[in-house]
Amino acid sequence: IAQVLYPEGDNSGNQRFFTDQARNSFVALGLCLFERHARDRRLQLPKAQPPTLGQLYRLSIGDGRPMRDWLQLLADDDLLSDSCRTSLRALCSQADDTLSSILGSLQAPLGLWADPQLDAATSGHDIALDQVRRQRMTVYLCITPDRLEQAALLVRLIFSLLIRDNTRTLPEQDPTLRHPCLLLLDEFTSMGRIDILAQSVSYMAGYQLRLLTVIQSMAQLDAVYGAEQARNLATNHATQILFAPREQQDARLYSEMLGTTTQRRQQRSQGRDTSHTEILDS
């Protein structure tokens, strides 16, 4: 989840540092939530609720006191594991400006869960993503155009988890994995880059995952995945259906993909005294 929420970016020195720190902070706060939940369940407390991204967002913004004091309060909980407390203390040890930048990077994608509707919708689930090859089901994920930009991150997260959970075990290794699963992605590029999809497209068919994507042009795919990854994605689709292009560049590309065919025709001409037959290739 952290890799989807905090992608690599341009890999420059500062950017890489803050990306790594945001991921580490996300994991530390996630551990804190899960360990608190496990403790509450052991004590049979009525407030014991499964951890959610909404809860993690609220944990990341604190309770109103200075953030360093809030994080230190979390780290001082003796009932948390050593690894969780160590990660929280490492975050507290950062300089003020650095800590502020790390927390800004951490909270940026989690800001989606400030929306109470999204928070409520992602606080429970009706399906388990690792069951799509075990049970016959159809799952629709519908986003209206006015919410597409806002929901793109959530859609990437869902499909990343779906692919991750279903490329761990081959059907030959588990007889309960009986059903192929088709991922039909309309307006594929509108959800942005899904790194795990670009990495797994060459072998996911072996796990009975089928991929059907709909795009407007190859230029869209190039813009999101880059020329090489876009070509790799297109190549790993067994069939491509091309409709009449609107742009000359797409027309040339499709023409090159289709290649040329030699047609042989015979032409015969006859005069008063002579007859001539010619075979032409075109």
Place the predicted regions along the sequence by residue.
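P-loop NTPase motor core of the ASCE superfamily
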Residues: L5, G9-R23, A28-L31, A198-S202, ...
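Hydrophobic/aromatic beta-strand patches that form the interior of the parallel beta-sheet core
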Residues: V139, L212, Q240-I241
